[in-house]
Amino acid sequence: KLNLENMNLALNKLKKTYKIYAPKVFEGAGTFSDTDRVRYGEVSTIEEIEFNEKSSYSYKETILPIRQTLFFFTEDDCKEAEVDERPALIFLRSCEIHSLKRIDDIYLRNGFEDIYYKKMRERAKFVLIGCEKSFENCFCVSMGTNKTDEYNAYIKVDGQDVYLDIKDEEIANIIASIEKEEKEVTPDFVKENEVNVNIPENLSLEVMKSTMWNEYNERCIACGRCNFVCPTCTCFTMQDITYKDNKNAGERRRVWASCHVDGYTDMAGGHSFRKEKGQKMRFKTLHKVYDYKKKWGYHMCVGCGRCDDICPEYISFSTIVNKLEGAMNEVKNND
């Protein structure tokens, strides 16, 4: 247990070793005029960290940048881009720690290791922010991601007091000289959400035949927001950029991509696997709650609810999931 002043002293010491990322308020950066946005950024003090609101974007952008230069090239040479070697200390919630396992599956355990992600992942440590209450649209309890013990440290702020549970030896050693009171600290976890989802046990690819997907041909505007705020979406595209002053030199960038946006499945000859918006919604939904579990043994979705929070058309992913049982019955009756 520390007071706020001593916690800031601890952060100051940690900042000499780590880049510290946490959800913080960006004033005036909201969707509407004179509104704020909570997303991840570097912090130096405990007061900067936003504990009481869910961040609009997940921690994902701290270890998987929205835009990342992989290498530079000329006519004769190719040079890998340098990576900031400083380790990172990232504050995040239980559902997001679970999502980290999903990103690791894709980039580290999916046939080969992605060296660019691996470099950033290996230098990251994670501080769990407890959830005393559920936020709007969260359904982490249904997805089994409301609890975790996979953290390097845990933090809770209660008024002028800060409670820490530190598992990582390096972090403990760095702040060992800070004045503190020894106490037993147990993380806060949500026990129930206002939103619950039911994923049918008999869910199969037959649900693709359901008419439920047609609704999203009209409602979805293919903006891709749901993918970009999601802590488990991992798709990207490649961009080769050449410089104006030398067309024979440039760089290759990896940039986040969205399975909802036009062009995602385009192939040579103008062909595309999924042209209708409802087909794209079906693909994303089944990836999150069907085929991923077939391969890895658990669902990709962690129930953070950000897709529901951000959708400009008020499409609710949790509602889509809860429609699947009816869709399976529809297909069964039609057969």
What is each of the regions a protein language model found here?
Residues K1-S204:
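Iron-sulfur-associated redox domains of electron-transfer enzymes in respiratory
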Residues I199-E218, F236-D335:
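Ferredoxin-type iron-sulfur electron-transfer modules in oxidoreductases and energy-metabolism complexes
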Residues N6-A10, C226, V255, S316:
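General structural feature for long, well-ordered alpha-helical segments within catalytic domains
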Residues C220-P231:
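Oxyanion-binding "anion nests"
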Residues K24-V25, T232-T234:
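Short, well-ordered beta-to-alpha junction loops that form the rim of enzyme active sites
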